[in-house]
Amino acid sequence: MASSLIFLLLVTLTFSASTLISAKSNTTTIIESTCKTTNYYKFCVSALKSDPRSPTADTKGLASIMVGVGMTNATSTANYIAGNLSATVKDTVLKKVLQDCSEKYALAADSLRLTIQDLDDEAYDYASMHVLAAQDYPNVCRNIFRRVKGLAYPVEIRRREASLRRICGVVSGILDRLVE
């Protein structure tokens, strides 16, 4: 009797462990295969694996997670520019440029919010269009700086722009996979 219970316990534990390993492997496989369609594989895998929703997400869910990362980036950049830079600047031209840049990042966040709605509606063409718009708004900010003689594009804004561009690139790659 005792040996039957031990055998049953061992079979149950073995089955449970193999199920957990299989589920983890399947999650890793879906993230990795999804990220292979992007231009930023390592970044994509790292970002998705760090989100607790990823293990249960399908490809569309992974796209939504990355869009959320982009919305956070764009919103925090808009707030950073508006709060940290604009508030301390006395130069009216620079202040106006920073306000314009803050608005562009807010528009990028709005475009990404629309992308979430497009994903829910499975309107992937519109989702792609909104992601491209979100990716382009920071370029407008950089161009505003270029047009004003003597203004240097701040390093932190440049870094955040590159980050948003990378995030949007990942989302675009995932959207391409959804269209296939």
Curated annotation (Swiss-Prot):
Localization terms from the record: Vacuole
Glycan attachment residues as annotated in the record: N26, N73, N84
Gene3D superfamilies according to UniProt: Invertase/pectin methylesterase inhibitor family protein (1.20.140.40)
Any single Gene Ontology cellular-component annotation: vacuole
Keywords assigned by UniProt, alphabetized: Disulfide bond, Glycoprotein, Signal, Vacuole
Disulfide-bond pairs as recorded: C35-C44, C101-C141
SUPFAM superfamilies from the UniProt entry: Plant invertase/pectin methylesterase inhibitor
GO term, biological process aspect, one: negative regulation of catalytic activity
Pfam families: PMEI (PF04043)
Family annotation (CDD domains): PMEI_like
Main location: other
GO molecular function, one term: enzyme inhibitor activity
Domain of life: Eukaryota
Entry-linked InterPro entries: Invertase/methylesterase_inhib, Pectinesterase_inhib_dom
Segment forming the signal sequence: 1-23
Tissue expr: Mostly expressed at low levels in seedlings, stems, leaves and flowers (in all organs), and, to a lower extent, in roots and siliques.
NCBIfam families: PME_inhib
Summary of the function given for this chain in its UniProt record: Inhibits fructosidases from both cell wall (cell wall invertase CWI) and vacuoles (vacuolar invertase VI).
Protein family according to the UniProt entry: Belongs to the PMEI family.
Protein name as catalogued: Cell wall / vacuolar inhibitor of fructosidase 2
Species of the source: Arabidopsis thaliana (Mouse-ear cress)
